[in-house]
A protein has these predicted regions:
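Soluble non-cytosolic domains of exported or imported proteins
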Residues: 8, 113-120, 176, 180, ...
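Pan-zinc metallopeptidase signature
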Residues: 238-240, 246-318
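Active-site recognition of the HExxH zinc-binding catalytic motif
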Residues: 179-199
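Auxiliary, metal-adjacent structural segments of Zn-dependent hydrolase domains
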Residues: 99-161
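N-terminal low-structure segments adjacent to metalloprotease catalytic domains
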Residues: 1-98
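Post-HEXXH active-site segment of zinc metalloproteases
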Residues: 196-226
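Acidic, His- and aromatic-enriched active-site or binding-groove loops in soluble protein domains
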Residues: 158-177
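An active-site-proximal "capping" alpha-helix that borders the catalytic cofactor pocket
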Residues: 126-129, 228-243
């Protein structure tokens, strides 16, 4: 199993394009990134962006449009239209690409120096836990994207029905930031396994119907309950906040206990309302001990695995 990072200007361009078109109003939309990416846009470009936005929003599966754009599979008229009308904007994007290209090259080389040999057995156990064959753990490609200079950390996206991950690393490169980038890559790789799991879908749906619907709990702001269940499990596997099941291999440290992180979370509660991301990480941490037992004992995912996290949501969101 190998994870290979690469630079592809066309992939990065279409990611930039969909961001500046502002088609997405979900939790995935990042306003600071939008602002940075958009600073090169001129008034004359707005009709193009409006048309791109309309095409993506009108599709029954907008994320499939994005997957095909990133894969450069222009196999219908809307995809070909987006590629055609957006071509003049490549010059706008070029200044952003050139500004970070040198650092992206360093990140590509660093990521490709990572070894995943020590993670392969653990990832195979995770596949079994999800009801997948061990051979579901396969090679993946990481396409690097321009980050914004002020970004506090790396961010990634696992593209459904593909073998690739989109990654915005830190804007600057140094050895201390490698660990965070590696964790994000494995978090997104975990999403790829979760996306394949019918058992996860069944367990999540059953948990939602049993615990969420009867109490009419409202999901954390910016998230649907479907995305919450996905993130709960992915954070349990790899997280910059709670470490996750893979923490010993990724950081050389065990993941923290609930009691160890409780003072920090309670300070957040006392000072201000925690972010949705912080709430989901905190809930994931409560799942982690039992999830670890399931994986090590080769038990498959079921509804019960989510119950510790649901109790946290019940306390915080009711």
């Amino acid at each position: 199993m190998n994870i290979v990072a690469t630079l592809n200007k066309n992939v990065a361009f279409f990611y930039w394009l969909q961001t500046v078109s502002k088609w997405d109003k979900s939790y995935a939309f990042e306003y600071p990134l939008f602002t940075y990416y958009r600073h090169v846009i001129q008034p004359a470009d707005e009709p193009i962006l409006s048309q791109v936005r309309a095409i993506i929003q009108s599709d029954s599966n907008p994320y499939d449009i994005l997957r095909k754009l990133y894969s450069e599979k222009f196999d219908n008229k809307n995809l070909r239209l987006i590629a055609h009308i957006s071509a003049p904007l490549m010059d706008r994007f070029d200044s952003i690409w050139q500004a970070c290209h040198e650092n992206l090259v360093m990140w590509r080389n660093a990521i490709n120096d990572f070894s995943y040999d020590d993670l392969y057995p653990q990832l195979q156990k995770i596949a079994v836990f999800l009801g997948l064959d061990r051979q579901a753990v396969q090679d993946s490609t990481v396409f690097l994207l321009p980050p914004r200079p002020e970004a506090s950390g790396p961010a990634g996206h696992k593209i459904s029905s593909s073998n690739f991950i989109l990654l915005r690393p830190h804007y600057s490169f140094n050895d201390q930031k490698k660990e965070a980038v590696r964790i994000v890559i494995l978090h997104e790789y975990a999403h790829g396994l979760i996306q394949q799991s019918k058992l996860f879908q069944e367990a999540g749906r059953s948990s939602y119907e049993k615990f969420i619907l009867p109490k009419k709990l409202v999901s954390p702001p910016g998230y649907t309950w479907r995305s919450v269940y996905n993130e709960l499990l992915a954070y349990c596997i790899a997280s910059r906040t709670i470490g996750g099941y893979l923490s010993p291999q990724l950081t050389g440290r065990p993941y923290p206990t609930v009691d160890e992180l409780r003072p920090s979370f309670e300070r957040l509660l006392a000072k201000r309302k925690p972010t949705s991301n912080q709430i989901i990480n905190w809930a994931s941490l409560h799942m982690l001990p039992e999830l670890t037992d399931y994986i090590e004992e080769e038990k498959m995912i079921d509804t019960a695995i989510f119950e510790p996290a649901i109790k946290v949501f019940d306390e915080l969101l009711s």
